[in-house]
Structure formats: structure tokens, C-alpha cells
């Protein structure tokens, strides 16, 4: 079985939620059914990107709880859907999304210098702090002049905003934190299932060693 040699925040979250499901999705590549929540999220991100690119004149309805904020992003020239690819030495690979050396991939929904914004169509989860930290860590690595990074999460349905601030003094410890978690994922050979609150929605539960047949 071919191992997965690259990661993203969502991939790592999937593994830590359930290693068996991670194996099914990322290694065995068992096709996933269509998800209403995923489709909704992709649509909102596409609309936001096209508005910031000037292809849509006014913020569409799906963004209406943040109309003023989106107008300000556009006015200030925010970069939408900015992609970054790093190798396993945490070095930037320019235009490297499909590179054979790609180790970490991420996309920022919007950025103005050291101010980053992520758009969410779901609710707030504590794990979003880790996502914010990863974005800030990568931004510090690719922009050595940035010592402080502010990351905001805009929850498009509720209008809620979460703000996180990061400083370069923590970068070394943060990198060690990521490497420890990623090494565990990439060196796993067992992929043991982890029963959790999401099992009842899991599309591979019928073949799960724990949940199969339920």
C-alpha cells in the first residue's frame, strides 16, 4: 500500500480523528459520496474569491453578514486563494502545488500582508486554532520580515469572528509540534480506527473493524 507523502491541515485533522478513515480516504482512495456541507463551503469560497478578484461587483447574499468587511478586503487589495507548497525542510517551492517534492500544501482564503482571513461556512471548532497557527507559521517562514501574524476566522453563517495572534518567538516550538504530529501520521502502518462522535456519519463505517455491521 502506497504511503501518503504530503499533508495539509485537513489531512492531519482527518488522521487524528480516525486513522482508519484517513487510510481509506488518502491511501486506499475509496471514493467519497457528495457532501452538502462540502458543496456549500466550496460555493461560498468560489463566490468570495470571484468578488475579491473583481469578477462580481457586489458581495453576494452568501457573504451578507460580512458585506462591509469584504468590501474593505477588496478595497485594500487582498490576495484571494493564495497557495503555498513547502518541502520537508519547510522550504517554499514556488508554483510547486504538483511538485514531486511537495510535503505541505495550504491555501489562504485572503491575505493583506501579515493579516490572514479564513472563511468558514460551518461553526467554530477549537481545532481552528491549530489551523490558524499553521497558516501563521508558514507565513513567517516564507516572509522573514513578518514577526507578528494576525489570523481571523469569519464564520459566514453566524457572523462570528475569531482572532488569533502569533509571534515569531514561538515558531521553533510550533515547527517541532507539527513535525511530531506529522511523523506519527506518515509512519503509521496500523491505521487503527478511533470511535468518535462522527462515526454515525462515516461513509466507510460498514468496513470499519470497530463499527462494521452496525
Model-derived features: positions:
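Short coil/turn segments at secondary-structure boundaries
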Residues: 26-28, 36-38, 59-61, 76-83, ...
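Short small-residue beta-strand/loop micro-motif enriched in glycine and branched aliphatics
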Residues: 116-119, 161-163
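Short, polar/flexible loop-turn hinges at active-site or ligand-entry regions and domain interfaces
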Residues: 30-36, 123-124, 189-192
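Short amphipathic alpha-helical segments and their helix-coil junctions
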Residues: 2-4, 20-32, 114-117, 179-189
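Catalytic cores of nuclease domains that cleave nucleic-acid phosphodiester backbones
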Residues: 47-116, 123-130, 144-152
Amino acid at each position: 500500500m502506497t504511503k501518503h507523502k504530503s499533508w495539509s491541515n485537513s489531512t492531519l485533522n482527518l488522521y487524528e480523528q480516525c486513522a482508519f478513515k484517513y487510510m481509506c480516504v488518502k491511501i486506499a482512495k475509496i471514493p467519497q459520496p457528495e457532501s452538502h456541507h462540502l458543496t456549500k463551503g466550496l460555493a461560498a469560497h468560489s463566490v468570495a474569491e470571484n468578488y475579491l478578484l473583481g469578477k462580481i461587483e457586489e458581495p453576494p447574499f452568501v457573504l451578507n453578514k460580512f458585506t462591509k468587511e469584504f468590501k474593505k478586503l477588496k478595497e485594500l487589495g487582498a490576495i484571494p486563494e493564495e497557495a503555498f507548497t513547502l518541502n520537508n525542510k519547510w522550504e517554499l517551492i514556488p508554483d510547486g502545488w504538483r511538485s514531486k517534492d511537495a510535503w505541505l500544501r495550504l491555501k489562504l482564503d485572503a491575505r493583506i500582508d501579515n493579516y490572514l482571513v479564513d472563511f468558514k461556512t460551518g461553526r467554530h471548532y477549537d481545532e481552528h486554532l491549530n489551523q490558524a497557527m499553521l497558516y501563521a507559521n508558514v507565513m513567517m517562514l516564507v516572509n522573514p520580515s513578518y514577526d507578528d501574524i494576525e489570523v481571523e476566522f469569519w464564520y459566514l453563517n453566524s457572523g462570528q469572528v475569531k482572532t488569533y495572534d502569533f509571534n515569531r518567538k514561538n515558531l521553533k516550538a510550533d515547527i517541532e509540534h507539527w513535525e511530531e504530529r506529522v511523523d506519527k501520521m506518515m509512519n503509521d502502518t496500523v491505521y487503527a480506527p478511533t470511535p468518535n462522535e462522527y462515526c454515525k456519519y462515516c461513509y466507510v463505517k460498514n468496513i470499519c473493524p470497530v463499527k462494521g455491521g452496525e
